[in-house]
A protein has these predicted regions:
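A short, structured beta-strand/loop element
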Residues: 38-46, 50, 118-133
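Short histidine
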Residues: 15-16, 150-162
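Short Cys/His-rich "knuckle" micro-motifs
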Residues: 42, 51-53, 81-83, 153-156
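Iron-sulfur (Fe-S) cluster-binding modules
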Residues: 1-24, 89-91, 95-98
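Short Fe-S-cluster ligation motifs
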Residues: 3-7, 58-85, 99-123
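Cysteine-centered iron-sulfur cluster-binding motifs in ferredoxin-type domains/subunits
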Residues: 28-44, 60-76, 112-114, 144-153
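Ferredoxin-like iron-sulfur electron-transfer modules
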Residues: 14-35, 48-68, 82-89, 132-142
Length: 162
């Protein structure tokens, strides 16, 4: 594991990124972007174990299963890429969880309201701070509606604890 700069971090704010690697797959976790929607650990609990440290154990499933699960992440908190020499078919690693995924422009952005939870934004979107600085550009954004988040305007899962 290592720390690095988050490429989608808020302007001027250093965020932590954790790296998990095998010979065939590199997984990045940006904890400050995570809304704790639980898609990862509900889909692949043998890899994503929130109660353990480290909480990601890549040996628990095939790289292809991990890739499919990361592609379900609604916040871009989990990302992946294939290292040089990976045996994984590159065509399988083109989804929204890929570090190389390009956000395609859409005509409409879809915003879903979660009962007693956040707003799920799907589609090419950009979020700007009050000074006009771009703080996030993504195809998956989860916005806080409860006001408890420590990562405004993004949901950090704080509503689960009230």
């Amino acid at each position: 594991m290592m720390n690095d700069e988050n490429p989608t971090a808020k302007t001027g704010q250093r965020q932590v990124v954790k790296e998990y690697q095998t010979a065939d797959l590199i997984v990045y976790w940006y904890p400050q972007q995570c809304s704790h929607a639980s898609k990862c650990w509900q889909t692949l609990p043998q890899v994503f174990k929130p109660e353990e440290r480290p909480w990601i154990t890549l040996s628990g499933a095939t790289p292809e299963e991990v890739i499919k699960t990361i592609d379900l992440c609604p916040t871009d908190a989990l990302k992946y890429k294939l290292p040089e020499g990976s045996k994984v078919d590159p065509a399988l690693a083109q989804g929204p969880g890929s570090m190389d995924f390009k956000v395609a422009p859409t005509d409409f952005i879809k915003i879903n309201m979660v009962k007693s939870g956040p707003l799920l934004v799907k589609g090419s979107a950009q979020i700007y701070d009050p000074e006009g600085n771009l703080i996030k550009k993504s195809n998956h954004i989860v916005l806080c509606t409860c006001g408890l988040t420590a990562n405004r305007p993004f949901c950090d899962g704080s509503h689960y604890h009230r």
